[in-house]
Amino acid sequence: MSTWMMFMFQESNSFYADNLVSFHNLVMMIIIMISTLTIYIIFDLFMNKFSNLFLLKNHNIEIIWTIVPIVILLIICFPSLKILYLIDEIINPFFSIKSIGHQWYWSYEYPEFNNIEFDSYMLNYSNLNQFRLLETDNRMIIPMKIPMRLITTSTDVIHSWTVPSLGIKVDAVPGRINQLNLISKRPGIFFGQCSEICGMNHSFMPIMVESTSFKFFLNWINKQN
């Protein structure tokens, strides 16, 4: 989760988040290199007292500054498309979880497990042992290293189910069902919040995901039944 004075991404807890962080590092490296070169050229032009008044055109330079940006854009394009398709493609999920947005709480359903369902409300943050505006009364429990499908929709306005450390952000739109892959690579508790302004209490509908071992997950399922 995010902490004070944290300027980078949260620690990634899924393979999709790993890919997104790597892609971000690649793009940032390219941006820094281009920005440094541009600043150097501008500074050099201002400091240089010499100028060539007879240089009106140069085909070699024009070819270079046309080809180089194309190559850079392709370097950015291919990893981006790969990550988008990896996140969007649903391949043999072990089971599905439904996430339903309401004003202003989330509901979760496990249709393959005797249709387990429950609501998840934000807890009162008067307890100092809790994270302010992030703790919920019921957590979404998932097994780690198991591919799942997250299905989300809304009953009223547009919400957005977002857990940054899992690399997930999907809109919950009324009358529409969106889906994407969900997988956690380690046990832990991951926090998120609705990321679509949805009304007065938009800031008070947190998301709390607990990733556990498969054995513990089955025990939790049995207790719910």
Curated annotation (Swiss-Prot):
Binds a dinuclear copper A center per subunit. Residues 1-25, 83-225 are mitochondrial intermembrane. Its EC number is 7.1.1.9. Cu cation A1 binds at H159, C194, C198, M205. Keywords: Copper, Electron transport, Magnesium, Membrane, Metal-binding, Mitochondrion, Mitochondrion inner membrane, Respiratory chain, Translocase, Transmembrane, Transmembrane helix, Transport. It is an enzyme of class 7 (translocase). The keyword Cytoplasm does not apply. It is found in: Mitochondrion inner membrane. It comes from the Eukaryota. The chain crosses the membrane at residues 26-47, 63-82. Mg(2+) binds at E196. GO terms for biological process: ATP synthesis coupled electron transport. Residues 48-62 are mitochondrial matrix. It is a multi-pass membrane protein. Its cofactor is Cu cation. GO terms for molecular function: copper ion binding; cytochrome-c oxidase activity. It holds the Pfam family COX2_TM. Cu cation A2 binds at C194, E196, C198, H202. InterPro entries: CcO_II, CcO_II-like_C, CcO_II_C, Copper_CuA, Cupredoxin, Cyt_c_oxidase_su2, Cyt_c_oxidase_su2_TM_dom, Cyt_c_oxidase_su2_TM_sf. Belongs to the cytochrome c oxidase subunit 2 family. Component of the cytochrome c oxidase (complex IV, CIV), a multisubunit enzyme composed of a catalytic core of 3 subunits and several supernumerary subunits. The complex exists as a monomer or a dimer and forms supercomplexes (SCs) in the inner mitochondrial membrane with ubiquinol-cytochrome c oxidoreductase (cytochrome b-c1 complex, complex III, CIII). Component of the cytochrome c oxidase, the last enzyme in the mitochondrial electron transport chain which drives oxidative phosphorylation. The respiratory chain contains 3 multisubunit complexes succinate dehydrogenase (complex II, CII), ubiquinol-cytochrome c oxidoreductase (cytochrome b-c1 complex, complex III, CIII) and cytochrome c oxidase (complex IV, CIV), that cooperate to transfer electrons derived from NADH and succinate to molecular oxygen, creating an electrochemical gradient over the inner membrane that drives transmembrane transport and the ATP synthase. This is Cytochrome c oxidase subunit 2. It comes from Apis koschevnikovi (Koschevnikov's honey bee).
